[in-house]
Amino acid sequence: MLRDLFVKKKKYAAIPSEQVRKDVPDGVMTKCPKCKKIMYTKEVLKNLKVCVNCGYHHPMNAWERLDSILDEGSFREYDKEMVSLNPLEFPDYEEKLESDRKKTELNEAVVTGEGTIDDMLVVVAVMDSRFRMGSMGSVVGEKIARAVEKAYDLQVPFIIFTASGGARMQEGILSLMQMAKTSVALKKHSNAGGLFISVMTHPTTGGVSASFASLGDYNLAEPGALIGFAGRRVIEQTVREKLPEDFQTAEFLLEHGQLDAVVHRDDMRESLRKILEVHQGGEMAVWQS
């Protein structure tokens, strides 16, 4: 139109999106998925990967978790050399395993070993959701069972941090049988008076939640963790009802008696220390032959 000729247009400097991305190197900033606040990654790491604005607990890898709860330099790893094979010849499974090994620098989805918390010896297992979404295959189950047996032999408590999508479909029944294997090992440990502390982190689902994750003498969880067996949509379609908004969260499970406590990451080491201290010399520490 003619009037557009007499209207002074605003001038804008066009900045290519690629140029913007280059100005901020990858990994320098972290965006909270809950409150959407953008902050320096170093601040998030300094705060144990908890959002300083809303308290959202970002996922931790296995080594970060171990560093946050164990005495410095006390950890000794078990069964590091164990790796999964492809007994069912599932297509592309070996390639995916190798890709995850390179990406995570782990051989499997769980790290096991022994260490101390305030000089109290424990055997610990930490699942890492970066490796095949923390799914439980034959090696994951075997490493956890061996760790429990080591706790039995040493007559010390066993602690596990779970983060898993459930059983690993590429291993079929070999994966499902790990539910029984780990549960039997924990039963032996319990019958001997052994203490087992399970800490469920986001997410703990499927066969893991239906087996060893829920068998603790103390069942703890981090705030906001998703904990359940089947997915929300599957359950709603099955029962034909709308589920509560907070269904399958750690807080929901605590309210309904399925957890003993929801523990903030800042308080996790101290909470574990107190539990261990209470059971030193008590009934749970009386081992039977």
From Swiss-Prot:
Family matches, as InterPro entries: AcCoA_carboxyl_beta, Acetyl_CoA_COase_Trfase_b_su, ClpP/crotonase-like_dom_sf, COA_CT_N, Znf-ACC
GO annotation terms (biological process): fatty acid biosynthetic process; malonyl-CoA biosynthetic process
Protein name (record): Acetyl-coenzyme A carboxylase carboxyl transferase subunit beta
Class in the EC hierarchy, top level: transferase
Subunit comment: Acetyl-CoA carboxylase is a heterohexamer composed of biotin carboxyl carrier protein (AccB), biotin carboxylase (AccC) and two subunits each of ACCase subunit alpha (AccA) and ACCase subunit beta (AccD).
GO cellular component term, pick one: acetyl-CoA carboxylase complex
Keywords: ATP-binding, Cytoplasm, Fatty acid biosynthesis, Fatty acid metabolism, Lipid biosynthesis, Lipid metabolism, Metal-binding, Nucleotide-binding, Transferase, Zinc, Zinc-finger
Listed GO MF terms: acetyl-CoA carboxylase activity; ATP binding; carboxyl- or carbamoyltransferase activity; zinc ion binding
Zinc finger (C4-type): 32-54
Gene: accD
Species classification: Bacteria, Bacillati, Bacillota, Bacilli, Bacillales
Cofactor binding note of this UniProt entry: Binds 1 zinc ion per subunit.
Known catalytic reactions: N(6)-carboxybiotinyl-L-lysyl-[protein] + acetyl-CoA = N(6)-biotinyl-L-lysyl-[protein] + malonyl-CoA
Binding site for Zn(2+): C32, C35, C51, C54
Major subcellular location class: cytoplasm
Role: Component of the acetyl coenzyme A carboxylase (ACC) complex. Biotin carboxylase (BC) catalyzes the carboxylation of biotin on its carrier protein (BCCP) and then the CO(2) group is transferred by the transcarboxylase to acetyl-CoA to form malonyl-CoA.
